[in-house]
Amino acid sequence: MQFSTFQQDLNTWQGSSLIFGIVEEDLKNQLQKINFIIDSKLLLEKINQKKFNGEKGKILNFDFFDQRLQTLKIIGLGESKNINSNDIKNSLADVIRKSSDKEEKISILFPWELINSPEEIQSFGESARLSAYKDNRFNSKRDDKKVLNEIEFLNLNKFKNINFNETEYICEGVELARRLVAAPPNSLTPLEMSIQASKIAKDHGLEIKILEKNECEDLGMGAYLAVAKGSDLEPKFIHLTLKSTSPVKEKIALVGKGLTFDSGGYNLKVGASQIEMMKYDMGGSAAVLGAAKALGAIKPDGLEIHFIVAACENMINGSAVHPGDVIKASNGKTIEINNTDAEGRLTLADALTYASNLKPDSIIDLATLTGAIVVALGNDVAGFWTNNNMMASDLKTASSQAGEELWQMPLQKSYKDGLKSHIADMKNTGPRAGGSITAALFLEEFFDKNIKWAHIDIAGTCWTDKNRGIHPSGATGYGVKTLVQWIKNKR
């Protein structure tokens, strides 16, 4: 899907589908804006019949079969003094989602004078495109419905020079993440994930290194490889690098959990554990690769960015790791495995150590790590932990700009006692209470403490069972926009 703008005289506009935003005050004068395409007096009568006065979130649909304008969607924006971009994005998403299989091109005309910045308008474009997303790869039946392939913004006035290139790049990154998360585990294997990473490298000029099992053994990655032992599929350790063409002012590592399927191992997922949904246990790596795709196109100067994914499956066979085994991570720490279903943190242990050895200024890891974070924050908000107050502030700002909810959680040091082992340096899980916190405390043991670090648990946000805001039901691609915005803010 592409974005376009129309800045000419509206009387020359040739579109057939229009979304028109309207505030509560003085409907008659506002409707004059579209008098070029429809009799505004007649339209006002129809609107009054429906008792509509521009209330926030209310939507009116009109179909015209005997005019050039075929469809008109009117979105109520509420009082002009209280206009809210997030409300607009959600209403726009709702309209676009319902229209995306009926129209090939949709035009949008809002009271742009009430919008504060071009970034807000870009976010409207983002909302429109991402809400129209459909994934029919695994459906044998191909319908003949239309596909929305263009969003046009009319008369942007003071924002007439707006550029939607970066918006398109970010949407492409989110869409890649959604496709990866939604792909079934017999389709998205560790090998396939490495192929997808190689394609990103080829398309955008990134360097790539894929470590095979024997190379991971040489690096002492006993935690990551312990998880992979039960699968017939070889693990793939993926390292993408986006280099800067100018002197590097900051080096960053983004690390994603990459379990392409998680059975739970010998602590098998049963009952309400939703084993059939464990294809999305690589949501963190999907966000990292989606960010790599977007940033590879944007090419932020002065930054060297490393994208790291330890991809594997957690399965059961005669070689699989046992509950009670003691393993050694690549930083030399020994770990007693008291739960094979807490495998993501084991793969991240070696991935974080690897990232730390690159000597970055900061590391962010993303993972569908704990059910505890879903209990704490639900499905709309991800939790994050960090060892640096400035990083916390920067992430909150970036997530707010990106429209992805993020809530800071405590690194409660007293909870570390729950990870003590009688026979090893630590256990891989603590008690049930505070489970997402002890998971973060576990990860904190695997990188240089002088590095700024944040851990984002996206277990609740990477998937939605129903349409939610800009997300159609299914994979959300959560995390891509926040990561990209956080990087963009450093330019």
UniProtKB/Swiss-Prot annotation:
Its cofactor is Mn(2+). InterPro entries: Leucine_aapep/pepB, Macro_dom-like, Peptidase_M17_C, Peptidase_M17_leu_NH2_pept, Peptidase_M17_N. Coiled coil: none annotated. SUPFAM superfamilies: Macro domain-like, Zn-dependent exopeptidases. GO terms for cellular component: cytoplasm. The keyword Manganese applies. It is found in: Cytoplasm. PROSITE patterns: CYTOSOL_AP. Mn(2+) 2 binds at residues 257, 262, 281, 343. The keyword Metal-binding applies. Keywords: Aminopeptidase, Cytoplasm, Hydrolase, Manganese, Metal-binding, Protease. It catalyses: Release of an N-terminal amino acid, Xaa-|-Yaa-, in which Xaa is preferably Leu, but may be other amino acids including Pro although not Arg or Lys, and Yaa may be Pro. Amino acid amides and methyl esters are also readily hydrolyzed, but rates on arylamides are exceedingly low; Release of an N-terminal amino acid, preferentially leucine, but not glutamic or aspartic acids. GO terms for biological process: proteolysis. Its EC number is 3.4.11.1, 3.4.11.10. Binds 2 manganese ions per subunit. Presumably involved in the processing and regular turnover of intracellular proteins. Catalyzes the removal of unsubstituted N-terminal amino acids from various peptides. Belongs to the peptidase M17 family. This is Probable cytosol aminopeptidase. The gene is pepA.
